[in-house]
A protein has these predicted regions:
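Extracellular ligand-binding/catalytic regions of CAZymes and related secreted enzymes
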Residues: 22-34, 52-53, 63-64, 92, ...
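Short, solvent-exposed loop/turn segments at secondary-structure junctions
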Residues: 46-47, 107, 134-136, 205, ...
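Bacterial N-terminal signal peptides
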Residues: 8-18
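Positively charged n-region of N-terminal signal peptides that target proteins for export
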Residues: 1-6
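A glycine-rich, often tryptophan-bearing local segment used as a flexible ligand/cofactor-contacting loop or short
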Residues: 93, 102, 107-198
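Hydrophobic/aromatic beta-strand patches that form the interior of the parallel beta-sheet core
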Residues: 40, 128, 222-224, 268-270
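Helical hinge/lid and interdomain linker segments adjacent to catalytic or ligand-binding clefts
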Residues: 27-28, 38-42, 46-137
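Catalytic beta-strand/loop cores that center a nucleophilic Ser/Cys/Thr
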Residues: 24-25, 62, 68, 82-85, ...
Length: 389
């Protein structure tokens, strides 16, 4: 009886460990800058494919530079990756993190899961954030409602985005779209005043497919990047002269934790970050350099630091609603894994409202259009939702 009970307990423990491992993704490096260092990536946005950006960067930092990288995703009820998912198992990995890479949009999680993030900031951990991280929470209730991007209480005005990164989604005092998203790409270059900053070593020009944001950096920020809106989605010299150059990224040396305490910690923010943006070598280089600088290892940054892609990387078209479905964290495990799997199905095409939004997305992405037309020809047929596109 005792043996049976013991075996049952051991089996339950093994199952629990396996379950936890299946819900997060870990890339373990062996040697390099990051030996003995742990970077945790939070990947949970609705649109810009943080679930692709984060693993791609994590692979580079682990394989090329020796870091241990843990990627935590929003998941659905079946354990598949879901942008904007309200369940993020594995947040306890933040307990021993040396650096946080934060890529989220409008999250709404359990108090327990948010608590691990709050604890990280209360101990003054460094952080790199991209794109929508300035508006990482929305609809959070109760204990952590102050983290919401639109929080107006004096105790944490502007929520996590404004207090940690220095901006929130607000046209007057924070960020807003600048140019036509999904239609106009942008050219991002180093700010002239920061040419000698270690993060910018080797960075010359980034083509970003994600549309520009107009940001208002906080007073204590060091400007790092400028952005010029293009009239084209793909890289070109066709500059939109109606849109003057604005800021696209900065660093700062402190933030306000949720308790209200000022923490001396390095912060880097960049307003690009869609997975398609990582097709730019300098786009990857800036973010890899940012992680190394934020962690305090800037003496290891080199002009020719290896930022080459690990494995196969085929980024998805960013959009809100239609994306690859059924992919689980372990599908992305291993150096040779593909981000994202070639056999992943396109989800969301049964929702007419989501399909309608695809029109301007597929216009600039002929390969995606061809795949959808092959698998769902009725959408392009006469009377179909994508007729004429």
């Amino acid at each position: 009886m005792k043996i049976t009970t013991l075996l049952a307990a051991v089996s339950a423990t093994i199952l629990l460990i396996w379950s936890a491992a299946a819900e997060t993704l870990v890339y373990q490096g062996t040697r390099g800058i990051g030996t003995g260092k742990h970077i945790v990536f939070i990947a949970n946005d609705h649109e810009y494919r943080s679930e692709e950006t984060c693993p791609a960067l994590a692979k580079i930092l682990a394989k090329r530079h020796g870091f241990r990288c843990t990627v935590i995703f929003g998941l659905d009820e079946n354990g598949a990756i879901k942008g904007g998912g309200r369940n993020m198992p594995g947040m306890e990995a933040l307990k021993d993190a040396d650096l946080l890479f934060f890529y989220a949009r409008f999250m709404n999680l359990t108090d327990e899961q948010v608590g691990f993030l709050v604890d990280y900031f209360e101990r003054g951990g460094p952080v790199v954030g991209v794109r929508t991280s300035t508006h990482g929470f929305n609809g959070q209730k109760g204990k952590w409602a102050k983290l919401n991007y639109n929080y107006t209480g004096d105790d944490y005005f502007g929520g996590l985005g404004e207090q940690i990164f220095g901006n929130t989604w607000h046209k007057e005092r924070g960020q807003s779209h600048y140019g036509s998203n999904h239609v106009m790409g942008c050219r991002i270059t180093p700010d002239a005043t920061a040419a000698a900053h270690p993060i910018l070593m080797g960075v010359e020009s980034i083509h970003a497919y994600s549309g520009a944001y107009k940001s208002q950096p906080p007073a204590d920020a060091t400007p790092l990047l400028d952005v010029q809106v293009l009239n084209t989605f793909h890289a070109s010299d066709d500059l939109n002269t109606d849109k003057p150059v604005v800021n696209a990224g900065w660093s700062r040396d402190s933030y306000i934790a949720p308790s209200g305490a000022k923490k001396n910690a390095r912060v880097v923010y960049a307003s690009y970050g869609a997975s398609e943006d990582l097709l730019s070598e300098d786009g990857r280089r800036f973010l890899i350099n940012a992680c190394i600088w934020a962690g305090g290892w800037e003496n290891k940054i080199k002009q020719n630091l290896n930022v080459s892609i690990v494995g196969k990387f085929t980024p998805s078209a960013y959009n809100n609603g239609v994306g690859l479905a059924g992919v689980k964290p372990l599908d992305l495990a291993g150096w040779n894994s593909q981000i994202m799997p070639a056999n992943a199905e396109i989800g969301g095409l049964s929702d007419p409202e989501k399909v309608k939004k695809l029109a301007r997305v597929i216009k600039n992405r002929p390969e995606l259009r061809a795949r959808i037309a092959t698998e769902y020809p009725e959408l392009f047929a006469k009377g179909g939702l994508l007729e004429g596109f």
